[in-house]
Amino acid sequence: MKKILSVLTVSAMAVSMLAACGNSGSTATTTKAAEDAKETTAAADKAMAETKAAVEAMSGDFSDKKVGICIYQFSDNFMTLFRTELESYLVSKGFKKENIKVMDGANDQATQTNQIQNFITDKVDVLIVNPVNSSSAATITDMVQAAGIPLVYINREPDQDEEKRWEDNKWNVCYVGCDARQSGTFQGEIIRDIGMDKLDMNGNGKVDYIMIKGDPENIDAQYRTEYSVKALQDKGMEVNKLDEQVGNWDQATAQSLVANALAKNGKDIEVVFCNNDSMALGALQAIQAAGRTVGKDIYLVGVDALSEACQNVLAGTQTGTVFNDFLTQSHSAGDAAINYLAGKENEHYIKCDYVKVTAENAKDILALLK
């Protein structure tokens, strides 16, 4: 509103100066006044155009707004659901599909950084970024802030120091996502609720497990790894880590890692924790190939609640998963972008909640995914 008032003031000045031209008795004075008035009028026209854009944003007209979206890797099953829903939501809010550009970072930060620079050069109105590496957030933020473009991070949370920097500088930067500690805790609770009498199949008084991690630099992977086990320990259960490997969120990689772990540790493995469902699907392939049966002589949990994983939970071939609510997250990310375009502020951390998924509610979650 302040911007609109200032533009009206500039316009009034232009009119006054034009009137002054007509009242001058000096040709030189008249010429100079006319030139000044011309410059002022041009400035007013430019400001009025900017104001029109601001008013359109405030009234919900986003048809000419350009949105740049950077996804860390298109082949990630969860991020495919996320980006598809995000695009659809933005279109439903009045953005033109041709003005929404989505780029595949191919799991390479240098590639993604170049894509962000290209979006800046193209003068997009807002950027939504799912970083390849959360540790690169400071560099990304500095690039985008220097260009004066609002920035919404999704799915992969930058560290607390970076988020504090946004707040301290009052930048138009925010993060939309879930607290990965909650997802890890929910994984642990799903296993904990089975009970020690069923979990401790080898009778050593401990929960013997292997951990298949995502990207080791990713904060979500770190928290899920830590808090899934912590949920057991907090209830007095002793744990024994037999193996921990990096699966990089990939199904085929996880299948190979779990196959090797099963060959090495045999029946001693009682629980397989996976940082996401893609890796849990790979783990299940290895478990079945080894002649083991989920729910009978081994337990398996993931995160994301992919459709196939939920079907496996219903069938009893996956113990449980955690719904990474891409619907709420993608809509919240779209709303955050809209707020920035309308000249409004966002909280720097927009939190969404995870949901535990077991056989009791997997059917309900599947219904949401259709």
Where are these regions (language model features)?
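Positively charged n-region of N-terminal signal peptides that target proteins for export
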Residues: M1-S11
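A residue-level marker of the well-folded mature domains of exported/periplasmic proteins
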Residues: K3, A20-K370
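Bacterial Sec-type N-terminal signal peptides, specifically the leucine/valine-rich hydrophobic h-region
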Residues: A14-L18
